């Protein structure tokens, strides 16, 4: 609630833009890693589903309540980012072995992290007509693995969840 006075303010050149097709630079990710150190992959645990179900209906996916039910049944923690602080989001994302989400603005929080993410699975919610999913260029360099699902019938997400939950039990 009060202004912050700094003796020195460091500003890095803008390194990420909407619709970029080049991956985020290693230099920029190094700066972010210094600011928010990543937990080792071996310490990351659990599955997180970032939900849009409590947003206005125009921003949601029809049937997302079912996805939440399914992911919760598989042991996933359901997160509604608009209900928690940025710091809580960063801690949850840095600690998760796997993050599953519908594409949307919630993944901009990832841009505050360097290479702190485990496995990321993004489910398409709007058509890209075969174009490069714009989030890939800044998510992929930050995570252990990145999968962008454009077909809900692929079954990969279900198989992945079974593998993760079996390893955690």
Q: Which residue ranges define each predicted feature?
A:
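The feature primarily captures lumenal catalytic ectodomains
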Residues: 1-169
